[in-house]
Amino acid sequence: MTTITVLAGGIGGARFTRGLLQHLAATEPEAAVTVVVNTGDDMWLDGLRICPDLDTVMYTLGGGINEEQGWGRPEESRRTSAEIAAYGRGWSWFTLGDLDLATHIVRSDLLRSGSTLSEATEFLCRRWQPGARLLPMSDTPVETHARLAMDADEHRAGDLIHFEEWWVRYRASVPVTEFVQVGLESAVPAPGVLDAIRTADLVILPPSNPVVSVGTILAVPGIREALRSTPATVVGVSPIIAGAAVRGMADACLHTIGVATSAEAVGLHYGSRAGGGVLDAWLVDETDAGALPALAAAGIRSVAVPLWMRDSETTMRLAADALALGARSGG
């Protein structure tokens, strides 16, 4: 039985993994997939623990995602958020849907009752049946914050604000000097995460944000080391096509850490395992085929294929390309 581990953020990682599961259902139904999900976007809001990436992956794989926006539930209403706002509470820039609130309430109750985030996630997945094992990167609370380079509304230059505020409220338009993972120093991988990496036949870094999604997962002590030492082949899929982020504002994140917005630069940022990085192989889009020589020179086997996940067919084809590249790149 083939075992595959995916290190995923939100929308891009969720959609890729769905395509992977659909492809495997048709070609290798006995394959087992584990998804290690970024929890750096997590936060407390109005007494509830919000886990944006875990929920996006769970809803997407479980058939409950709002396909148009890529997050949240379809046919959602926001009456409760409106009532919270009427009390002068909550954040005007971050509203919680009424259906989505049920997930947050159940999760928060489980956490307050002594469950770990892993246990709460397992419980929530019993309803959604995502077809893969979902693991948070850590049960330790880790929250990504952005340090502002300039004043913004009530915030002053140098202040740290939660990543979701920078991402959702400011649409990554306010320059930042760094990203800080609060709580990272005491974090450990969640149970099963290291084993999922060490015992996999293939590890995939999907087209998620390389800085604050996959990058945050890799920053958890022990995970990068497990990737470097696993006997599995590690294949990445570029989140950059023709010099632009596929979704969101990943270019602003890359700029903050001094990495160019290109498939080549992100591949080199991850680095080859032979050179101390985490990649054996890297998929880039056909429009970025010119990057292949530089990537090969750095020890990263790369192939140019269509990367746009426009529908289930193209996403399944991309997943098949990742599997094929992994098979060709294995030791």
Which positions does each model-derived feature cover?
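C-terminal functional extensions of proteins
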Residues: R247-G331
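A short, Lys/Arg-enriched amphipathic alpha-helix followed by its capping loop at the start of a domain
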Residues: R15-A32
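A short helix->loop->beta-strand "cap" motif at the edges of active sites that frequently abuts
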Residues: P29-A31, T230-V234, L279, I300
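Short Gly/Thr/Asp-enriched flexible loops that form oxyanion-binding sites at enzyme active sites
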Residues: T17-L21, S213-L227, L292-A296
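Extreme N-terminal starter segment of soluble prokaryotic enzymes
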Residues: M1-T5, A31
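Redox- and metal-dependent alpha/beta enzyme cores, enriched for Fe-S-associated oxidoreductases
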Residues: L218-A260
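Active-site glycine-rich loop that binds ribose-phosphate moieties when present
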Residues: T177-I197
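Electropositive, gly/pro-rich neighborhoods at or near active sites that engage anionic ligands
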Residues: A25-T27, V37-Q181
